[in-house]
């Protein structure tokens, strides 16, 4: 099941309540403010603080 990008309009980071961005390659939602990544499992975002992992922005070399 694919992630529905329309959800980005209504979901928010559970920590700071800020906007989330979709990382299609990694199948996760990113909060750049808190630098956290939330997994997407079977098309459903898992927006639990204890399931978030630290996120580092990828830089091109």
UniProtKB/Swiss-Prot annotation:
**Where would one find coiled-coil regions in this protein?**
none
Gene Ontology CC annotations of this record: cytosol
What domain of life? Bacteria
Pfam families in UniProt: Trm112p
Q: Which InterPro entries match?
A: Trm112-like
Fetch the SUPFAM superfamilies from UniProt: Trm112p-like (SSF158997)
**PANTHER family, alphabetized:** PROTEIN PREY, MITOCHONDRIAL, ZGC:162634
Name the protein family. Belongs to the UPF0434 family.
Q: What is this protein called?
A: UPF0434 protein Sama_1339
Record the organism: Shewanella amazonensis (strain ATCC BAA-1098 / SB2B)
Which lineage do the record's taxonomy fields give for this organism?
Answer: Bacteria, Pseudomonadati, Pseudomonadota, Gammaproteobacteria, Alteromonadales
């Amino acid at each position: 099941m694919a992630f529905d990008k329309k959800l980005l309009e209504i979901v928010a980071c559970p920590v700071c309540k800020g906007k989330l961005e979709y990382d299609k390659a990694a199948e996760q939602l990113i909060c750049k403010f808190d630098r956290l990544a939330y997994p997407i499992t079977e098309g459903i975002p898992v927006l639990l603080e204890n399931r978030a992992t630290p996120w580092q922005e990828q830089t091109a070399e």
